[in-house]
Amino acid sequence: MTRISLTRYLVEEQRKHNTIQPELRLLIEVVARACKAISNAVSKGALAGVLGSAGTGNVQGETQQKLDVIANEVLLDANEWGGHLAAMASEEMESFYEIPNRYPKGEYLLMFDPLDGSSNIDVNVSIGTIFSVLHMPKPGQTVTEADFMQPGTHQVAAGYAVYGPQTTLVLTVGNGVHMFTLDREAGSFVLTHSNVTIPDDTKEFAINMSNMRHWAPPVRRYIDECLAGEEGPRGKNFNMRWVASMVADVHRILTRGGVFMYPWDKREPEKPGKLRLMYEANPMAMLVEQAGGAATNGHQRIMDVQPEKLHQRVSVILGSKNEVERVTRYHLEAEDKA
């Protein structure tokens, strides 16, 4: 059986659908190479002295881990000189990073969470890199933050790399979801799962149950029904999973179904959610929808949300379509009664 590398897959998609421009193909390959470098750093862990806090904070007010900083630098260094990008934006940087004038500039914008789930680094649990690609609205002109303010429907590619027992790159360019496993001996990502689909129904949910007392009534209603099991209104037993790493939780859902929820809660009522829209929720929503699932903020499709700022937050409910639609319906019913 012929093994299909990431490069070959992208070239063949370019030939078949003519939707992957050569510059986009090269950009994705550069991101993949950066993910290989990050995977190598993660796998060395304490041997390379990369565990623990960096002693700094990011724009979100979160403590940066050493690997957060390393992963961010790897992605910046790998992508700035290739000529495919006009600018980049990262969870770890307050403002966007425009490609320096000493390098050629391209027609794409890249956004990323360089190391999602970094609180799990020191305990050796799966973490990952999430990325999203947009067209630069005005190629050749000076980049502004407004250029990034595009809804998720404008994404031309989205994906993540999960660093676990295997390193797996999960990608969509708008023609389904495909998974590539890193062959460390060959040094390349190899296609291992094509056209991944999420089942419409599930018996598994992922949410941080310790926050139950802070949830809005629609979320409480949904979880209470799940916990009631066979004797409850759902008539079936549910299992709960929670890794505290969005990449790991979404990867499980893409692999076997389920629903992931990181909802608004009363602890910080002024914030619409915890996760970031532009480089966490949008790329994951694109992947989930391309796999036949759904993704909403409880009120509307995530990819229809119009961004207003780079680090905008959003409530997230995504995964198996029928479950996401049920949770969303509960939110809309609560709105109608209010």
UniProtKB/Swiss-Prot annotation:
Main localization, broad class: cytoplasm
GO terms for biological process, alphabetical: fructose 1,6-bisphosphate metabolic process; fructose 6-phosphate metabolic process; fructose metabolic process; gluconeogenesis; sucrose biosynthetic process
Cofactor requirements of the protein: Mg(2+)
GO molecular function: fructose 1,6-bisphosphate 1-phosphatase activity; magnesium ion binding
CDD domains in alphabetical order: FBPase
Record keyword Ubl conjugation present: no
Transmembrane stretches, start-end: none
Compartments it resides in: Cytoplasm
Reactions catalysed: beta-D-fructose 1,6-bisphosphate + H2O = beta-D-fructose 6-phosphate + phosphate
Source organism superkingdom: Bacteria
Pfam family for this entry, one: FBPase
Binding site for Mg(2+) 1: E91, D113, L115
Any one cellular-component term (Gene Ontology): cytosol
Magnesium in keyword set: yes
Chain positions recorded as Mg(2+) 2 binding sites: D113, D116, E280
Record pathway: Carbohydrate biosynthesis; gluconeogenesis
E.C. code: 3.1.3.11
Record InterPro entries: FBPase_C_dom, FBPase_class-1, FBPase_N, FBPtase
Cofactor binding annotation: Binds 2 magnesium ions per subunit.
Residues noted as binding substrate in the record, renumbered to the chain: D116, G117, S118, S119, N208, K274
Keywords: Carbohydrate metabolism, Cytoplasm, Hydrolase, Magnesium, Metal-binding
Subunit structure: Homotetramer.
Protein family (similarity comment): Belongs to the FBPase class 1 family.
Entry-linked NCBIfam families: PRK09293.1-1, PRK09293.1-3, PRK09293.1-4
Protein name in the entry: Fructose-1,6-bisphosphatase class 1 1
Organism (species): Cupriavidus necator (strain ATCC 17699 / DSM 428 / KCTC 22496 / NCIMB 10442 / H16 / Stanier 337) (Ralstonia eutropha)
